């Protein structure tokens, strides 16, 4: 299933009762000269981008207490600073359904947009909502204030993770109608 967004065309997967689009980039990768800075809107692409797999999650430590580790946490797989992606589940692409945006917990140092997978699928199967989850920078990648330590050379505010979430919400509002969601 191919959907056209303002960033470019993406290919998702048709599941039994819904469509899924995973690992959609919503901002430029926060690496190199973009590290420690506010997110920059994603530049449009020309090819069809495959969005059938979850994107990388922000680097994070394994859980301290082994008994806390459950299938809900994706701490062991595919960690990379290039993690600004989101996921969309929708039962109908030509509708105007309310949008449920899920921002994962984890005390701002662990977790990912994949943590809600089973809940998102269940909610989506119900047919009442379009569900979106996101990855954002965590721990020092998202909350390290460097502007004072570097005499302004690195203008990091220490709120880059929250700015990531805002950038994701902007992308969602601009593009969710392509997935059957109401942008308002």
Language-model-derived ranges and their functions:
Residues 154-178:
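Alpha/beta-hydrolase active-site loop
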Residues 179-184:
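Alpha/beta-hydrolase fold nucleophile elbow
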Residues 1-159:
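Non-catalytic accessory segments of hydrolases
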């Amino acid at each position: 299933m191919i959907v056209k967004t303002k960033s470019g065309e993406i290919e998702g997967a048709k599941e039994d009762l819904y469509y899924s689009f995973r690992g959609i980039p919503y901002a430029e990768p926060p690496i190199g000269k973009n590290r420690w800075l506010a997110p920059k809107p994603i530049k449009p692409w020309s090819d069809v981008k495959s969005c059938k797999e979850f994107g990388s999650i922000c680097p994070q430590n394994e859980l301290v207490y082994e008994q806390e580790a459950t299938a809900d946490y994706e701490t062991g797989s595919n960690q990379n600073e290039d993690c600004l992606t989101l996921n969309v589940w929708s039962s109908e692409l030509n509708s105007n359904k309310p949008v449920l945006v899920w921002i994962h917990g984890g005390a701002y140092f662990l977790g990912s947009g994949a943590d809600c997978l089973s809940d998102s699928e269940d909610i989506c199967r119900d047919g009442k909502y379009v569900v979106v989850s996101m990855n954002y920078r965590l721990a020092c990648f998202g909350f390290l204030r460097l502007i004072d330590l570097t005499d302004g050379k690195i203008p990091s505010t220490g709120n880059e993770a929250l700015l990531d979430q805002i950038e994701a919400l902007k992308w969602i509002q601009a593009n969710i109608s392509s997935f059957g969601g109401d942008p308002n």
